Amino acid sequence: MRMGKIAVGYGFLLLLVFQLGVRASTLFNKYNVQELSSLKDLLERLEEKLSPGEESDVYAGSEDLVNDPEEDADLILDNVRKQAEKEFYKPAGFRDENLQRGRLRSIATSARSMNGCFGNRIERIGSWSSLGCNNSRFGSKKRIF
């Protein structure tokens, strides 16, 4: 009986909180609508002030630009040089980390390339067979002491 009263009380509080939340959000939404309408008015006034003749004045300097292929090539070379300098002048920690990654990758790939197998299986005590080996190349069974 006591649990029922507690559940009803919490349910009532939950309903009250939801109702207050809805009221707060509608007030908030009205405020946003008013703000949006004032921003639209400002935007329209700005567009009216800016005439089509003034728009061409803003971009008048763009006609003076000429695309020279030699200048473009020089810019590309400069960017490549800057990138190379950034790589060269990186802190030693970054370079060492990349070297370590490369060494680990080479170890992992070299073991696979030398052996050609990816695992072994014990058939019985003292007898091993290669699982992923090409049988014609490595034979069907390998004996390990």
Curated annotation (Swiss-Prot):
Keyword Magnesium: no
Cysteine pairings via disulfide bonds: 117-133
GO cellular component: a single term: extracellular space
Highest taxon in the source lineage: Eukaryota
GO biological process, one term: blood vessel diameter maintenance
Name of the protein in question: Ventricular natriuretic peptide
Keyword Signal on entry: yes
Tissue specificity note: Heart atrium and ventricle, and to a very low extent in brain.
GO MF: hormone activity; hormone receptor binding
